Amino acid sequence: MLISQRPTLTEEVIAENRSKFTIEPLEPGFGYTLGNSLRRTLLSSIPGAAVTSIRIDGVLHEFTTVPGVKEDVTDIILNLKGLVVSSEEDEPVTMYVRKQGPGTVTAGDIVPPAGVVVHNPDMHIATLNDKGKLEIELVVERGRGYVPAVQNKASGAEIGRIPVDSIYSPVLKVTYKVEATRVEQRTDFDRLILDVETKNSISARDALASAGKTLVELFGLARELNVEAEGIEIGPSPAEADHIASFGLPIEDLDLTVRSYNCLKREGVHTVGELVARTESDLLDIRNFGQKSIDEVKVKLHALGLSLKDSPASFDPSSVVGYDASTGTWSDSGTFSDNDGGEQDYAETEQL
């Protein structure tokens, strides 16, 4: 099996909603393959939310005006197309705008329901004079890409319901370029640089993650034809390689205290890999192996970036009683009290 060096992905934040992502090194030719696929997916397939229809009080169609409002209905609709909104609901939801003049109507005047957020509250919608009054009902739905107003027109809709063009995509712009990069003596590897700009409703980082997930799901269809088919296998990352190497370490290298070491050896645990496959409950079942021994093991594994099978990822060694994280030492290194009748010395009480 051919093993390729694992590429790395780094992000350079350009602005609040714009980032440059660099993926390297890629096998020759894969820069364009990956770049084009990600770009097309980012522009067309990232889920978002948009207004699909509106209803303005006193208005029957879009080719008219509202008394006391500077903009006509067509202008109001054009303004509403620029609304940036996100919704957690899969079903259509309704928002309302009710404003009495004089003054301007902005997206900040919209009252959204729970689970819906308006991300550009300063966006201008309309201008009212002294006698102006504007009441708008907006329907928001989730979708992908662009849907014209004709497709948003529901059969049997009430009179006055005006369908709107929906721009669901939260991604504004995506560009990419491919450069040559060097790996050891070879200079024909690819470096892919993606420039992603989004609306306020999603970060560039999350948009790229969404595109990657979509492509993995689709390419998985081809892989399922034969999961044993030969291909290029991506090698482990440096962190993963370190973990793999750590699994083969003998537990002697953990520098455990006498009791903990002998208990584990008696139980048949000889390597770090065998140790991390155990849960805290498994270790507590070992004779003479108490909670303080478990704390010691967890601290030693944490130093290697590892943990027991059921240990939380948020484990903090400094929270362990008696352990000084700054020096890596125990305040009572020769003594444990594991509810076995008091504090006793390891070597003297070890039972084999």
UniProtKB/Swiss-Prot annotation:
Q: Where is this region: Disordered?
A: 324-352
Region annotation (Alpha N-terminal domain (alpha-NTD)) maps to: 1-226
* SUPFAM superfamilies for this protein: C-terminal domain of RNA polymerase alpha subunit, Insert subdomain of RNA polymerase alpha subunit, RBP11-like subunits of RNA polymerase
- Per UniProt, which keywords does this protein have? DNA-directed RNA polymerase, Nucleotidyltransferase, Transcription, Transferase
- State the protein's name: DNA-directed RNA polymerase subunit alpha
Where is the stretch described as Alpha C-terminal domain (alpha-CTD)?
A: 243-352
Enzyme class comes to: transferase
This protein's species is: Nocardia farcinica (strain IFM 10152)
Q: What quaternary structure, including any partners, is listed in this protein's UniProt entry?
A: Homodimer. The RNAP catalytic core consists of 2 alpha, 1 beta, 1 beta' and 1 omega subunit. When a sigma factor is associated with the core the holoenzyme is formed, which can initiate transcription.
